[in-house]
């Protein structure tokens, strides 16, 4: 069974539109990257451009590293960082809810009202959501 899973992973391909959705950019951007040779593509029997799963994975890692170039490194053990913009802050008497739009991802964090006030968090501010969890569930799409 393990060999079948590995074989399937090797055979996984994505259309330009699927790759764009996964990378959080427009299909035109992915086409330009492909035309410039930044992402290898092949064509299926109908002429549709396809991107290999391993090529897309490698490019997404390189793209993330490129986006973080020149930024100060945070001294933290949380490695899953999502830079974005604060889109909502809901304050309660004790707790608060902060929403961040990080590319195509909407992240919601519950924290204390005191922490929100100390950090001066407000709608429109740039922020980084850092995620550290003992359990992360991954489902196949």
Task: Tell what function each PLM region has.
Residues 7-25:
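Polyanion-binding surface elements
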